[in-house]
A protein has these predicted regions:
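Charged, terminal alpha-helix-loop-beta segments
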Residues: 1-150
Length: 150
């Protein structure tokens, strides 16, 4: 059986609307949500930047005038420097959109792939400070995620 990027997207999206599935993903090593999910979009077209795989937003109940956006980019293969640049392009596009509308926000990126290979030229970039990196493996026991610190 071939595991596709869309399959990974389907698995993750189930967790956005179902606490049981979210709990399973957390046990498997992937923790993307807090209790205050506001909205999520699949295949979000970002004007002038491309299409982000998943975008989720959290709203803090104590600071309703501020939202946090997480751009989630899925890779069937390796996460590399191009993946980081692609995710940063989406982050910049969304941030500009929210800025022009006067919406207070913070924004981060999450990259998920089956391998991680980021050259040292990217490790010194400020952009990595707001990024999370996960690798996954898929076998007879299901899917497992490992978070990598940069």
């Amino acid at each position: 059986m071939k595991f596709l990027e869309k399959d990974l997207e389907d698995i993750i999206c189930k967790s956005f609307t179902n606490d049981y599935y979210n709990g399973l993903l957390v046990k498997k090593g992937l923790d993307l949500l807090d209790r205050h999910l506001w909205w999520h979009k699949r295949q979000l077209r970002i004007y002038g930047c491309g299409i982000a795989d998943l975008v989720i937003s959290h709203r803090n109940p104590y600071h309703k005038d501020n939202i946090h956006v997480n751009v989630i980019e899925l890779k069937r293969g390796c996460i590399n420097g191009e993946s980081v640049l692609q995710c940063n392009k989406y982050i910049d596009g969304i941030s500009k959109y929210l800025d022009t509308r006067g919406i207070n926000h913070t924004i981060s990126g999450t990259l998920i792939g089956d391998r991680l290979n980021i050259s040292s030229t990217f490790l010194n970039r400020d952009d990595l400070f707001y990024m999370s990196f996960y690798t996954y493996s898929y076998d007879i026991d299901g899917i497992e995620f490992i978070k990598h610190e940069m």
